Amino acid sequence: KKCLPKSEIHGIDISKYAIENGKDEIKDRLILGIANNLPWEDNYFDLVISIMSLHCLHTYDLLKSLKEMQRVSKNNKYLCVESYRNEKEKANLLYWQVTCEAFNTPEEWEWWFNLAGYNGDYSLNYFE
């Protein structure tokens, strides 16, 4: 909000704690919910960002959540998720994870993105 003072920012989180402790500048536009049923109209946002959250969803929520991100975005999207490329990184992720539910390789994430028709940018985070 400080970088783009004329912007309209909204957020959704599954954590009541995160909503209650959100930044004062946007707190009134944060809602409790899950990405598989976003309350905004089609093409509502100029930019949709999901950072380190999709891997916290159960596998059965991934497809709908990715489709919802696609639906509410006019064009620009970015997401970042946890992933692993080998057994060591998978073990590191398993030991680290507290809320991670979707453990996917890069190829598996790409499969989910393609299945959902997700055409935005993304990055994968690894525990080396």
Annotate the PLM regions.
Residues 1-37, 57-64, 68, 76-128:
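Class I (Rossmann-like) S-adenosyl-L-methionine-dependent methyltransferase catalytic domain
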Residues 40:
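Carboxylate-rich, divalent-cation-coordinating active-site regions
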Residues 45-46:
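Local beta-strand N-terminus motif with an aromatic residue
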Residues 49:
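A conserved beta-strand element that flanks and buttresses the S-adenosyl-L-methionine
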Residues 53:
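Conserved sequence/active-site signature of Rossmann-fold short-chain dehydrogenase/reductase
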Residues 73:
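Glycine-rich S-adenosyl-L-methionine
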